[in-house]
Structure formats: C-alpha cells, structure tokens
C-alpha cells in the first residue's frame, strides 16, 4: 500500500508482472498482493487464471505472449478496462537458450531477443500511456548481461540490451515522472537453475561471497522496494549475494 496525497488514506497500487506463472514473477505478484495491492499476472500458461486466483482475490491473469504484438495490445486493453491505469510494470518474462556460437541457431537468437528485449520494449510502449506520474517500471536483468559466460551469447546479449533500454527509458520517461530501473538477480533457486548439475551448482556457489543461492522471495522484496523508491531511476540493483564482486 502507498499513502494518498492527504497522507491518511492508503491507496492500493496496480501492478502488472510478466512471466508470473512461476519463479521470481510469481513471488513478486504474491508479495504485492499480500501487501494489499492489485495485481495482473501475465504468462503463456493457459491456466494463468487459476494461478491468479490462488494468489489472491485482487489478482487476475492474462494468458499472453509478450513476443506477440497483438497479445501486448490485448494485455493493455485488459488493464485499462479493469483499472483504468497502471502504477507498476515488472518486465520479468524471460527465455534462456544456451549453447556456444557454433551451436546456436538463428531461431534461438531471435526467440531470446524477442522475449527478453523486444518484449519489455513492447510492454512499456503499450502501457506507459496508462501510467500516472510516479509510475514505475522494473526490468529484471541478469548477471550474464554484465559478465561474459561461455555458451550464453543469446541470453547475455538480450540482457545487456535490456540494460541499455532501461537507461534510455529512464531518461526519456523522467519528464513524465515515470521511473525505470533494473533488478539483477544472481544465482536463484528457480526451475531454470534446477536443471544445473550438482558440480556446476557447487562451482557457482563457490564464487558467491554469501555462499548460497538466492530465493525468489528475496528477489521479490528487492523488486518491491525498487518499485516504490521515489528518487531512483536509471539504477541497476544487483541482488546476487556479492557474485558480481567476485567474478
């Protein structure tokens, strides 16, 4: 909840979180809902409405793909019809396609860029007109967008591009008092990292000063704080247990 201008009446913020059927996106949506805010969750899962209902009564779901222009238009129309506006947009939807340069296909490259970079651009473009002064965009980045890891050309390039987009939009939208920031999770316990071998997992944890993986709930808390920080824009917030300091 945030305070109304008179300082007395609490006002529920209106959130939209992409990639929210599981993982970090789901945790962000659940946290916002638990604190009294209204939430729209977006995901390709056809059961997204049921997932929304399981989070809370003020949560609704839209089954959509951020890589499809028509779907993004439909998302914006749903939000406008329900709420008439939007306060916080969290661009969390992500796709990881790994492989060395000699193995990645054009389809891998294009699909990753479409989800991780073009998707957030389309979402901001479609929804920024619904955001009042004080609105907030939180883009979810990745450490690989700042440090080179072999076999991560697609993912690394897409997340590096998202950093650039964050910087440009922060400046461009500041005149409307809309803030744009990036949260960069480190090695987090999600379905994506669950497939990593024990050996690889131990090697990564060995580089993290705090010597453990992060949780989706910890990432959600940071997204919540960044979304509500009124004098922060164009910032990159690493939430990685110190990993970036030790690479």
Model-found features: residue ranges?
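Residue(s) in the substrate-gating loop at a strand-loop-helix junction
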Residues: 142
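Conserved glycine-rich Rossmann-like NAD(P)H-binding loop of the short-chain dehydrogenase/reductase
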Residues: 35-51
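Conserved glycine-rich cofactor-binding loop
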Residues: 21-22
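C-terminal substrate-recognition "lid" of short-chain dehydrogenase/reductases
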Residues: 130, 178, 212-239, 244
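Substrate-binding pocket helix/loop in short-chain dehydrogenase/reductase
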Residues: 100-101, 105-113, 204
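Active-site helix of classical SDR
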Residues: 124, 158, 166
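Alpha-helical segment proximal to the catalytic Tyr-Lys
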Residues: 129, 171-175
């Amino acid at each position: 909840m945030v305070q109304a201008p008179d300082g007395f009446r609490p006002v529920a913020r209106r959130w939209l979180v992409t990639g929210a059927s599981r993982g970090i996106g789901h945790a962000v949506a659940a946290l916002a809902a638990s604190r009294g805010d209204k939430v729209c969750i977006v995901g390709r899962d056809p059961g997204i409405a049921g997932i929304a209902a399981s989070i809370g009564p003020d949560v609704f779901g839209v089954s959509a793909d951020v890589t499809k222009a028509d779907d993004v238009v439909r998302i914006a129309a749903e939000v406008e019809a329900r709420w008439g506006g939007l306060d916080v947009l969290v661009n969390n939807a992500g796709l990881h396609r790994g492989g060395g340069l000699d193995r990645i296909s054009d389809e891998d490259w294009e699909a990753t860029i479409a989800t991780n970079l073009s998707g957030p651009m389309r979402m901001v473009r479609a929804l920024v007109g619904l955001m009042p002064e004080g609105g907030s965009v939180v883009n979810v980045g990745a450490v690989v967008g700042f440090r080179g890891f072999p076999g991560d050309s697609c993912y690394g390039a897409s997340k590096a591009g998202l950093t650039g987009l964050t910087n440009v939009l922060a400046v461009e939208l500041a005149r409307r008092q809309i803030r744009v920031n990036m949260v960069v999770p480190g090695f987090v316990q999600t379905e994506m990292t669950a497939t990593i071998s024990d050996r690889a997992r131990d090697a990564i944890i060995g580089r993290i000063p705090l010597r453990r993986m992060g949780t989706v709930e910890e990432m959600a808390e940071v997204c919540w704080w960044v979304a509500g920080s009124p004098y922060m824009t164009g910032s990159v917030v690493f939430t990685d247990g110190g990993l970036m300091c030790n690479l």
